[in-house]
Structure formats: C-alpha cells, structure tokens
Amino acid sequence: MVNADDDANAAGSSTFRNISVFEDHSDVYFSRNQVDTYDGNQGDGGTIEVTPDGSTLTVTDNGWRVVELPYDITPSTVVTFDFKSSRLGEFHGIAMDSDLSLNNGETRFALYGTQADSSSNEDYKTYDGSGEFQHITIPVGQYATSGRTNYLVFIADHDAGAKNGESVFRNVRVFDDTNGNLIDDRCDPAL
C-alpha cells in the first residue's frame, strides 16, 4: 500500500483496514503438483500436457491422471473448473479420492462421453461437445462423505477403438463456500 503526496504541503492521508494476505491453496496448479497415473488397473496412463503457467491439464488417449490434493471435505466444499473436449471418448470426468484405488469410495463425476457409469454421478454430464471450454461448478460436499480426500483425479477414458479421447481441465479450484456465492470462505468479506 502506498500513500504518495509529492506536492509542497505533503498532506496526504490514507487508512487501511481489515486487510488479509494469505496463500490461496484452493487453486490447482498442475506445474507444481506432480501429475501421476491413477490406479494401475485403469487406463494406460494416456498422454498429458500442462500449460507453462500450470493452469491447464490436457489428458488424452486413455488416461486416468491424479494430483495430490489433501483437503478436508465439508458439506460446503465446491470444485469449479473449465472443461472442454475435442475428441469424444467413452468417459470424461473428475473425481476426489483418498487412496488411489478405483471403485474404493472415490466420489466421481461424469462430464461427457459415450459410456454410462453406474459408479459415477451423471448430474454434471452436460458438456455439449463444442470443443470450447464450459465452466462447471460441482458442490462435491453434497455428494461426498465428509472427511479427508487426498487426490483429485482427471479422466479421459477411451480403452476401446481408437483410444483417442481428450479431456482438458483449466482453472481448477477446490474450496468451501458456505453461503453459495462461489467465493472461497477464507476470502469472503461477508463471512
């Protein structure tokens, strides 16, 4: 903060109040989070690409990828992100998991794809196939059991045929939003 009054009388005055500065851990930067293969029995790892600024992860072919994200899930936990796909696969999705094992209690959401998945929530399978980004907000705390999650999983499943599915995730954030205004509770002046 600066108060500058360079004229002869130098009578400038400023008041600053209720200022908080903190590191925001709710954004997922793929350049600083190791992107690993998820569950060796699922997918062949596929191919990944991370943008230089770390904001975007592309998973192609037949990939289930994971980043470590220790987070305490509460009923108000939300995940928001931009999603697009230019190559339709069988299953495109996102999940929160505690142990890197498929079908062992993870909370998984379908976003797009030709295959139905009875182990996934399909309420957010709304992507229109345009190849353009669409913003998605999922109130995961309403679906997941409260408790600790350790991983965020990014899915482009396409293990039949061409194996060329594509999922692109950008601007991924995980945070608590008690009052539903899509502002991280740690930053919300209303709380």
Which residues does each predicted region cover?
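Extracellular calcium-associated, cysteine-rich motifs in secreted modular proteins
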Residues: 177-191
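Short, tryptophan-glycine- and acidic/Ser/Thr-enriched carbohydrate-recognition patches
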Residues: 26-43
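Short carbohydrate-recognition loop motifs
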Residues: 42-64
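Solvent-exposed loop and beta-edge segments used for protein-protein assembly and interaction
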Residues: 72-75, 86-88, 130-132, 146
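Extracellular beta-strand ligand-recognition surfaces/modules
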Residues: 1-13, 19, 81, 92-96, ...
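Secreted extracellular polysaccharide-interacting domains
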Residues: 3, 57-78, 88-94, 99-124
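Solvent-exposed strand-loop boundary residues in beta-sheet-rich modules
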Residues: 25, 98-102, 158-160, 178
